[in-house]
């Protein structure tokens, strides 16, 4: 699916008003080959530790979007080229990171979509600390497991259920 976030917002003003459709803050940079992507969310809450990111991406993605609340840290990367390839191989359609990524040249040839706050060359810690399948606070919106994520050049939307145009 190639979402058009502007059309979704226009068609679902009632959901925007009642909070069942939310718009993330416009703070993300785009990476990966897919400029637009959509799917149900899988969620992680981590801080400067990407162990659970690898674990999540090793599982079949089944067309899902991995939403990572990295606490907005700008001190290290949570996703790099190896994890981008793993996501592509295992059927994830996208990754949204409240934090940093690295290996942008490698990520930009992965056939997935990625949104992140920034780029940082340093890798993260590996302590197996964090939570999966929990509600996460992303910039401007809470995301719960199973919410639908819609991403294109105009923004990132979070819906409590799958939307049609």
From Swiss-Prot:
It comes from the Bacteria. GO terms for molecular function: 4-hydroxy-4-methyl-2-oxoglutarate aldolase activity; metal ion binding; oxaloacetate decarboxylase activity; ribonuclease inhibitor activity. Its cofactor is a divalent metal cation. Keywords: Lyase, Metal-binding. It catalyses: 4-hydroxy-4-methyl-2-oxoglutarate = 2 pyruvate; oxaloacetate + H(+) = pyruvate + CO2. A divalent metal cation binds at residue 103. It holds the Pfam family RraA-like. GO terms for biological process: regulation of RNA metabolic process. Divalent metal cation. CDD domains: RraA_family. InterPro entries: RraA, RraA/RraA-like, RraA/RraA-like_sf. NCBIfam families: NOT-MenG (TIGR01935), PRK09372.1 (NF006875). Catalyzes the aldol cleavage of 4-hydroxy-4-methyl-2-oxoglutarate (HMG) into 2 molecules of pyruvate. Also contains a secondary oxaloacetate (OAA) decarboxylase activity due to the common pyruvate enolate transition state formed following C-C bond cleavage in the retro-aldol and decarboxylation reactions. Belongs to the class II aldolase/RraA-like family. This is Putative 4-hydroxy-4-methyl-2-oxoglutarate aldolase. The lineage of its organism: Bacteria, Pseudomonadati, Pseudomonadota, Betaproteobacteria, Burkholderiales.
């Amino acid at each position: 699916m190639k979402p058009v976030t502007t059309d979704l917002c226009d068609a679902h003003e009632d959901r925007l008003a009642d909070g069942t459709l939310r718009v993330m803050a416009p703070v993300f940079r785009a990476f990966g080959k897919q400029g637009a992507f959509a799917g149900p969310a899988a969620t992680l809450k981590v801080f400067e530790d990407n162990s659970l990111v690898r674990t999540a991406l090793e599982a079949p993605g089944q067309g899902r979007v991995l939403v990572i609340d990295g606490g907005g840290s700008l001190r290290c990367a949570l996703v790099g080229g190896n994890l981008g390839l793993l996501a592509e191989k295992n059927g994830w359609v996208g990754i949204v990171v409240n934090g940093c990524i690295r290996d942008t040249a490698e990520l930009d040839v992965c056939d997935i979509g990625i949104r992140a706050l920034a780029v940082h060359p340093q890798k993260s810690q590996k302590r197996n600390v964090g939570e999966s399948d929990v509600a996460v606070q992303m910039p401007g919106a809470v995301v719960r497991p199973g919410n639908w994520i819609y991403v294109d050049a105009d923004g990132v939307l979070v819906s409590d259920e799958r939307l049609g145009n």
